[in-house]
């Protein structure tokens, strides 16, 4: 990535989900800095710093998905922490045959917008309240707060996508509903302050990524259908 591209990424406008945090931080910053009392001014400085952090955390850069319908794309920015054959989540009703699951861990420094891995129809959404274990742990997929989606492709095959809250993340946002038709790379959700996203590939589809690889949501190719 060039220096100019890096600056464009950092300076990307924030997602609308940042609005309440930006307003709160700005208000604390302005009111705190407007008083001569030192403790209040320190609080104001903290408000300004928090606002700057939220501008960075909620950045929403433009992504350009590959113009091909036979690809599965990354659903999140971050680092691949696991590529494993597992049984899909029962709530998604994708059968009991083990499929490849690609887990991507998002640190607080990554872009946290979740994107659709392919074009299709959202045919199932299942939310589960749970714990807030470190999202990089494998057991987080079963015990943490999570939101599971089933995406049905035009050919009838299914892809599972799971948003998993982490140690710091306490709020999963999902912008789609069952019955929605979506495009590859389309924004569908966000997880605040550190998280993980799992993608379950259709049976017989092999992943093209490895553990430790850096992902770019909506652009990196996970697999070929």
UniProtKB/Swiss-Prot annotation:
Modified residues (Pyruvic acid (Ser)): 195
Pathway: Phospholipid metabolism; phosphatidylethanolamine biosynthesis; phosphatidylethanolamine from CDP-diacylglycerol: step 2/2
Cofactor(s) needed for function: pyruvate
EC number: 4.1.1.65
BP terms from Gene Ontology: phosphatidylethanolamine biosynthetic process
Protein family: Belongs to the phosphatidylserine decarboxylase family. PSD-A subfamily.
Assembly mode: Heterodimer of a large membrane-associated beta subunit and a small pyruvoyl-containing alpha subunit.
Name of the protein: Phosphatidylserine decarboxylase proenzyme
Organism of this sequence: Gluconobacter oxydans (strain 621H) (Gluconobacter suboxydans)
Gene: psd
């Amino acid at each position: 990535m060039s220096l100019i591209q890096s600056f464009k990424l950092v300076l990307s406008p924030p997602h609308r989900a940042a609005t309440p945090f930006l307003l709160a931080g700005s208000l604390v910053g302005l009111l705190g800095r407007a008083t001569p009392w030192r403790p209040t001014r320190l609080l104001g400085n903290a408000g300004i710093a928090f606002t700057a952090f939220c501008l960075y955390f909620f950045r929403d850069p433009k992504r350009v998905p590959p113009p091909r319908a036979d690809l599965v794309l990354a659903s999140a920015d971050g680092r691949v922490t696991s590529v494993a054959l597992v049984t899909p989540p029962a709530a998604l009703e994708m059968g009991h045959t083990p499929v490849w699951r690609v887990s991507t861990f998002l640190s607080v420094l990554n872009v946290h917008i979740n994107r659709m891995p392919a074009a299709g129809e959202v045919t199932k959404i299942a939310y589960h309240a749970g714990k807030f274990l470190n999202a990089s742990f494998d057991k987080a997929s079963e015990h943490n707060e999570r939101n599971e989606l089933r995406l049905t492709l035009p050919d009838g095959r299914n892809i599972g996508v799971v948003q998993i809250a982490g140690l710091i993340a306490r709020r999963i946002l999902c912008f789609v509903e069952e019955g929605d038709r979506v495009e590859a790379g389309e924004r569908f959700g966000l997880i605040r302050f550190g998280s993980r996203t799992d993608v379950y590939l259709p049976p017989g589809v092999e992943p093209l990524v490895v553990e430790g690889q850096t992902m770019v949501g909506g652009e990196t190719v996970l697999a070929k259908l």
